[in-house]
From Swiss-Prot:
InterPro entries named among the record's database cross-references: 6-hairpin_glycosidase_sf, 6hp_glycosidase-like_sf, Glyco_hydro_9, Glyco_hydro_9_His_AS
Main location: secreted
GO cellular component: extracellular region
Glycosylation sites: N337
GO molecular function: cellulase activity
Catalytic activity as recorded in UniProt: Endohydrolysis of (1->4)-beta-D-glucosidic linkages in cellulose, lichenin and cereal beta-D-glucans
Protein name from the UniProt record: Endoglucanase 11
SUPFAM superfamilies given in the database record: Six-hairpin glycosidases (SSF48208)
Signal peptide range in chain numbering: 1-31
One biological process term in Gene Ontology: cell wall organization
Compartments (UniProt record): Secreted
Length: 525
């Protein structure tokens, strides 16, 4: 760089700085307030940190959540298989395969859509680590083409105890699906997770990407050939993660992601030819979750319409689009006949009482992704009650995120560790008991209930980045450890936020660039 160019850049920077300071002084507000008032970069960083707190297994040297230690090091030993690793789903220590796989799918989708934004913030490596921690476990759990270990631990015995994961004395028995005990739902979701992750690692780790794709294809074939609900084969899961929607949505979901990962017409034909039989065109949804994937399938399928090579499938894809539009319009309060999603008085989407925030985060993600799709296509969303522009869709998603971060009647951030006020008694065994690093003495099964569970004091460790269940239908929130309906957090709550935060960071940067250009133009005049 020449001295002249260097001085020119310095002068330009000082000019912009002076204009920005002068403008902010006139307005009486900070530039942060101008673009929304929330630090989405901080929220993104903290959301990714949460997954490190949920890790099971031997923790790596670069573990950032230092109040955790190794746990579950004999998982699978009883069955003669290595099942060390993976994630605890929430505030307990069972490793439930179905919600874990959905978590990884959503993390991968976030990176696929907003990887550049994640890279610009320095968080891409953490996102990749979060995904790989899950997919490494899935590789272990898929021990042969038609066998998938679906769960480690028993929810009943696990919930009887209140212990740190480092002290676990509960059963670590593992449960599998196979040809005689099918589980098309968990096989399909795990296939989706590994297919989506294969896209993520395609350029940076092609060998690993190929390995993931191989497992994904085998799992999908297994799930499709030997059909059945996993909670019918494994009764132990029924009280915790029952597959209420069945397995049809997961088969379509897995095929859709395999098509995105391979561009193989076989999977495209499956999504089209099986659309009616598997309910893809009959179910008009108002939720998207670890159990119900139809809205995700419908949205992904509708996005294929813009590609000329899918012209032969346009009739079925258009039907998928109609169902995707129904979901989006229901979220935006633009449907008729009472099919809109309920909202709290302050405007939060409200699907059901237990862990409602999971539906808010997934809805915000789908709105965000589809708004970008419509913007690129230069089209709007057509609903029964009017047209919605891409900017309006993204704006509503942002309103939900801002509610989560503190713009709500309780003035509470429901993302733990973000902002001046957030839940301090999260329903989480590890965080609610003194850290193993500071208190190495063994804490027994019921000792945790006796000495820690009922305390009114804040948790000794902050579960940074966890999205708790959230407020009730009146925007009220009771921060008690025993109020697990509202204060328990889950990995699949936070995972979709990663993509939305990344997109909102882009939005902020765009606004700042536009303001800079406008201010410079005004100054020159």
């Amino acid at each position: 760089m020449t001295v002249m160019n260097h001085r020119h850049k310095q002068c330009h920077f000082l000019l912009l700085l002076l204009i920005t300071v002068f403008s902010a002084a006139l307005d009486g507000v900070s530039s942060e307030t101008d673009v929304g008032g929330f630090d989405y970069g901080e929220a993104l960083s903290k959301s990714l940190l949460y997954f490190e707190a949920q890790r099971s297994g031997r923790l790596p040297y670069n573990q950032r959540v230092t109040w955790r230690d190794h746990s579950g090091l004999t998982d699978g030993l009883e069955q003669g298989v290595d099942l060390v690793g993976g994630y605890h789903d929430a505030g307990d220590h069972v490793k439930f395969g179905l919600p874990m796989a959905f978590t990884v799918t959503m993390l991968s989708w976030s990176v696929i859509e907003y990887g550049d934004s994640l890279a610009s913030t320095g968080e891409l490596s953490h996102a990749l680590e979060a995904i790989k921690w899950g997919t490494d476990y899935f590789i272990k759990a898929h021990t042969s083409p038609n066998v998938l270990w679906a769960e480690v631990g028993d929810g009943d015995t696990d919930h009887y105890c209140w212990q740190r994961p480092e002290d676990m004395t509960t059963s670590r028995r593992a449960f599998k699906i196979d040809e005689n005990n099918p589980g098309s739902d968990i096989a399909g979701e795990t296939a989706a997770a590994m297919a989506a992750a294969s896209i993520v690692f395609r350029s940076t780790n092609p060998h690993y990407s190929h390995l993931l794709l191989h497992h994904a294809q085998q799992l999908f074939e297994f799930g499709d050939k030997y059909r059945g609900k996993y909670d019918e084969s494994l009764k132990v899961v029924k009280s915790y993660y029952a597959s209420v929607s069945g397995y049809m949505d997961e088969l379509l979901w897995g095929a859709t992601w395999l098509y995105r990962a391979t561009d193989n017409e076989h999977y495209m034909s499956y999504v089209v030819d099986m659309a009616h039989q598997l309910g893809g065109l009959s179910w008009a949804m108002s939720e998207f979750s670890w159990d119900v994937k139809f809205a995700g399938v419908q949205l992904l399928a509708s996005m294929l319409l813009k590609e000329e090579k899918h012209k032969q499938h346009s009739k079925v894809l258009q039907q998928y689009k109609s169902k995707a539009d129904h979901y989006l319009c229901s979220i935006l309060n633009k449907n008729i006949n009472g099919t809109n999603v309920q909202r709290t008085p302050a405007g939060l989407l409200y699907v059901r009482q237990w862990n409602n925030m999971q539906y808010v985060s997934t809805a915000s993600f789908l709105l965000t992704v589809y708004s970008d799709h419509l913007r690129k296509s230069n089209t709007d969303l057509e609903c029964h009650e009017g047209t919605v522009t891409p900017d309006e869709m993204l704006g509503f998603a942002k309103s939900q995120i801002d509610y989560i971060l503190g713009s709500n009647p309780m003035e509470t951030s429901y993302l733990v560790g973000y902002g001046p006020k957030y839940p301090i008694r999260v329903h989480h065994r590890g965080a609610s008991i003194a850290s193993f690093k500071e208190h190495k003495g063994f804490i027994g099964c019921t000792q945790g209930y006796d000495n820690w569970y009922g305390r009114s004091e804040p948790n000794p460790s902050v579960l940074v980045g966890a999205l708790v269940g959230g407020p009730d239908h009146q925007d009220d929130f009771d921060d008690r450890r025993g109020n697990y309906v509202q204060t328990e957090a889950c990995t699949y709550n936070t995972a979709p936020l990663v993509g939305v935060f990344a997109r909102l960071i882009e939005l902020e940067e765009q606004k700042l660039e536009e303001e800079d250009v406008s201010l410079v133009a005004t100054y020159k005049r």
